[in-house]
Amino acid sequence: MLPIATKSGQCTSFLDALFTATSAVCVTGLVVNDTATYWSLFGQGVILLLIQIGGMGIITIAIAIAVVSGRKIGLMQRSTMQEAISAPTVGGIVRRTQFIIRTTILIEIIGAVLLAPVFCRDFGFWKGIWYSLFHSISAFCNAGFDLIGIRTPFSSLTSYSVQPIVNLVIMMLIIAGGIGFLTWEDIKNHKWHFKKYRMQSKVIFMVTGILIFLPALYFFYFEFSNVPLTERVWVSLFQSVTPRTAGFNTADLTLLSEVGQMLIIMLMLIGGSPGSTAGGMKLSLIHISEPTRPY
């Protein structure tokens, strides 16, 4: 609501400010004002901070602050954290919290570094660095907030629909945030020994692959058949990755058929993985390993 948060120097209405803050901390990505053209650098920074808190989880942030301040973490707090990240046991929660924070920061820095050459070329060095960091955090946290509206308000990433670096990096960040921190723990501990992964991680990889590949095929053959081949490939892949709570888009979704829009809705409903930055019902709920049997 503060004047310093807007480029015009005017106060934002309470409802608009509340909506934006809620959308950011809940990593929803819905906006009533274009993030790039309406909010000042300070306002964008506040939004980014809320996205980061929402992505890692308020409980994770609280435990991290407690650890840094030297406070003892009680059993109730450990149990709450266990539920928040879908950990199998209460033991090792503090260690897992530290792992979550380190992994989040590392992946977001890598994403920003990879995006920097493109954004620095298009927007200048300092603005390019800021845009790279903002979009890296927003993508990893599956938030969907963007600053590309500086070209055309509310346009999301449509101006980068055929830019390979932006497409690849944003998609990988969305997937990285969406598979969950316990899956990243398996990757860290077992590397390429996939058989040693916990069942949840195996299910997540399998269902994630299916939910990217099959929608991409549909979009490629039925929704974007009238665009050039290169753009068709990138747009189809991107639109199969981003609906599961990320919120970016590189195509005008209003031009999709009703079937295509329904597919987008279903992907949004499914969401990401347990203990991830994504929302939705979670991947594990749609996977049935075997039919229920009487005993």
Predicted region positions:
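Membrane-proximal intracellular helices of multi-pass ion channels
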Residues: 1-293
